[in-house]
Amino acid sequence: MVFFTCNACGESVKKIQVEKHVSVCRNCECLSCIDCGKDFWGDDYKNHVKCISEDQKYGGKGYEGKTHKGDIKQQAWIQKISELIKRPNVSPKVRELLEQISAFDNVPRKKAKFQNWMKNSLKVHNESILDQVWNIFSEASNSEPVNKEQDQRPLHPVANPHAEISTKVPASKVKDAVEQQGEVKKNKRERKEERQKKRKREKKELKLENHQENSRNQKPKKRKKGQEADLEAGGEEVPEANGSAGKRSKKKKQRKDSASEEEARVGAGKRKRRHSEVETDSKKKKMKLPEHPEGGEPEDDEAPAKGKFNWKGTIKAILKQAPDNEITIKKLRKKVLAQYYTVTDEHHRSEEELLVIFNKKISKNPTFKLLKDKVKLVK
């Protein structure tokens, strides 16, 4: 956006607001641009569409600003608008609109955006006028490329030098030249994609070649192994050429035999350890049978010899040994089960079944009396 200063009052004004300012400030005859400092008399300010940037202003003498593609297109678009104003067949309403449009430097170049811009900035909502303005623009833009093509065409037909050269040059070189021209025309993305495809193809080809070589190398080895097996089965000796392969097979067999022997030794050691552990457990669990009372004969209720376990007799014997014929259920259970394990040896039941039997024997027998956590022998 271009800004001007009034030389009469010194007020800074946008390009769009100049007409309003002229109607207010009567002495306004000359306007000067804030950026470049040029003076514009009368209506000359309308042609000053774009000014220098801050980089160009403060960059020094040798500074050259970069030209943006969008700015070049915008300038061409605004020039087209100024050319359309001069046409005789344009209606006065449309001409006024075109004059207002030429004051802007950000005019859209597409129909939908252009019409929205007209509605917002110029407050034109009549669709017929909007269509008329756009049709004039589209006609002007379509007529330009036709004129350019006519200017570019040569007046006299010139002989094509490439045709004469192609007759002399061989076909292979011509193809290469055509491919090079096609590569030049392609975009950077297309070139990149082609390179990636070529690399992928090369990788695939290398993989296939390596795979084929490996398969060729593996086949003769398999055949040699098969021949050796056949010779061994027939009882024939392996030839000297294949002596190394025979030695390897023998070594493998020896290793397998030694490994099996070691496994057998380890298994035997483990069994011995388990047997010793079981014996130690049984020794720990063993308890001495209750001793006979002094000066008397052994009773019938005491624990019997190994074989069938006498629950009632063992419980009675343990209670008699206890002070006041009374003992806690926990201690009694421990002693009875220990005695059970010593009698039955290996053929004993699970702990759950033993606990159930123990509880039944205590609760149902009238000779045993339960007092909370203790058991007492009733005489």
Curated annotation (Swiss-Prot):
UniProt cross-references to InterPro entries, sorted A to Z: LYAR, Znf-ACC, Znf_C2H2_LYAR, Znf_C2H2_sf
Q: Where's it mainly located?
A: nucleus
PROSITE patterns the UniProt entry points to: ZF_C2HC_LYAR
Q: In which residues is Zn(2+) 2 bound?
A: 33, 36, 48, 51
- What are the inducing conditions? Induced by MYCN. Induced by interferon-beta.
In alphabetical order, the GO MF annotations are:
DNA binding; DNA-binding transcription factor binding; identical protein binding; RNA binding; transcription regulator inhibitor activity; zinc ion binding
UniProt region (Disordered), positions on chain: 161-307
Q: Which Pfam families does this entry report, sorted A to Z?
A: zf-LYAR, Zn_ribbon_ACC
Positions annotated to bind Zn(2+) 1: 6, 9, 21, 25
Per the record, where are the segments of Acidic residues compositional bias? 229-239
What is known about the tissue distribution of this protein?
A: Predominantly expressed in testis.
Task: Offer one example of a GO biological process linked to this entry.
Answer: positive regulation of phagocytosis
* Coiled coil ranges: 175-219
Record's compositionally biased regions (Basic and acidic residues): 173-196, 203-216, 256-265, 276-295
Modified residue Phosphoserine is at which positions?
215, 244
Compartments (UniProt record):
Nucleus; Nucleus, Nucleolus; Cytoplasm; Cell projection, Cilium, Photoreceptor outer segment
Q: Where are the zinc fingers (C2HC LYAR-type)?
A: 1-26, 28-52
Q: Name one GO cellular component term.
A: nucleoplasm
Give the keywords, sorted.
Cell projection, Coiled coil, Cytoplasm, DNA-binding, Immunity, Innate immunity, Isopeptide bond, Metal-binding, Nucleus, Phosphoprotein, Repeat, Repressor, rRNA processing, Transcription, Transcription regulation, Ubl conjugation, Zinc, Zinc-finger
Cross-link Glycyl lysine isopeptide (Lys-Gly) (interchain with G-Cter in SUMO2): where in chain: 14, 207
How the protein assembles, per its UniProt entry? Answer: Interacts with PRMT5; this interaction is direct. Interacts with GNL2 and RPL23A. Interacts with nucleolin/NCL; this interaction is direct. Interacts with phosphorylated IRF3; this interaction impairs IRF3 DNA-binding activity.
PANTHER family linked: CELL GROWTH-REGULATING NUCLEOLAR PROTEIN, CELL GROWTH-REGULATING NUCLEOLAR PROTEIN LYAR
Tell me, in a sentence or two, what this protein's role is: Plays a role in the maintenance of the appropriate processing of 47S/45S pre-rRNA to 32S/30S pre-rRNAs and their subsequent processing to produce 18S and 28S rRNAs. Also acts at the level of transcription regulation. Along with PRMT5, binds the gamma-globin (HBG1/HBG2) promoter and represses its expression. In neuroblastoma cells, may also repress the expression of oxidative stress genes, including CHAC1, HMOX1, SLC7A11, ULBP1 and SNORD41 that encodes a small nucleolar RNA. Preferentially binds to a DNA motif containing 5'-GGTTAT-3'.
Record protein name field: Cell growth-regulating nucleolar protein
